[in-house]
């Protein structure tokens, strides 16, 4: 079997990095980098219209719950084909935007940087598609002492298939790495 490399597509964007509070001078809290993966949706069974703001995602909130600070080191949206993708191709519109953008899943292709991807069919039947987050166009801090309004948000739209399907053609997820620091002092819970 041939090893297939993911198709990596870079989103065109306007360089407009978010601003954040500068760290205090002197010694900083130790930090660690941890991986994460969030399942967004299966595609090809019904219409998908999704908005995932990383700073308020429940999976990431659980991962960062015992830390005061969390920032994105790297992140990507990934489209994985499933076993039915060669016979039932599906398309998905994707864009990374700051969370205070007025863009919505239905306006992805009217927004600068919006992309349409086809998963399945004769050309991309077994290809994984990677869509990296451009950290120079959003604020990478998803948890801090203050709330930021420009943290990353992924918009996704995939129409319902023309014929009813029971098995998804593809899956969409977000994965990457977070830098966590400034541990919160919490009580130790004991089991009863």
Swiss-Prot record:
Pfam family for this entry, one: Tymo_coat
UniProt keyword Metal-binding present: no
Gene3D superfamilies: 2.60.120.20
A Gene Ontology molecular function term of the record: structural molecule activity
Protein keywords: Capsid protein, T=3 icosahedral capsid protein, Virion
Residue spans of biased composition, Polar residues class: 12-30
Gene Ontology cellular component terms for the protein in this record: T=3 icosahedral viral capsid
Similarity annotation: Belongs to the tymoviruses capsid protein family.
Physiological role: Self-assembles to form a T=3 icosahedral capsid composed of 180 copies of the capsid protein. The capsid encapsulates the single-stranded RNA genome.
Protein name as it appears in the record: Capsid protein
UniProt source species: Ononis yellow mosaic virus
């Amino acid at each position: 079997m041939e090893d297939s490399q993911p198709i990596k597509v870079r989103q065109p964007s306007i360089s407009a990095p978010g601003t954040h509070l500068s760290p205090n001078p002197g010694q900083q809290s130790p930090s660690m980098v941890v991986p994460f993966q969030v399942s967004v949706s299966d595609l090809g069974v019904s219409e998908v219209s999704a908005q995932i703001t990383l700073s308020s995602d429940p999976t990431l909130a659980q991962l960062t719950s015992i830390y005061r600070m969390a920032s994105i080191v790297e992140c990507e949206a990934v489209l994985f084909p499933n076993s039915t993708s060669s016979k039932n191709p599906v398309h998905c519109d994707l864009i990374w935007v700051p969370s205070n953008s007025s863009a919505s899943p239905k306006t992805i292709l009217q927004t600068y940087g919006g992309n349409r991807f086809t998963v399945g069919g004769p050309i991309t039947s077994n290809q994984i598609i990677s869509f990296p987050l451009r950290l120079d166009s959003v604020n990478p801090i998803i948890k801090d002492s203050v709330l930021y309004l420009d943290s990353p948000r992924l918009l996704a739209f995939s129409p319902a298939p023309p014929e009813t399907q029971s098995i998804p053609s593809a899956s969409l997820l977000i994965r990457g790495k977070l830098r966590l620091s400034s541990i919160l002092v919490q009580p130790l819970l004991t089991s009863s």
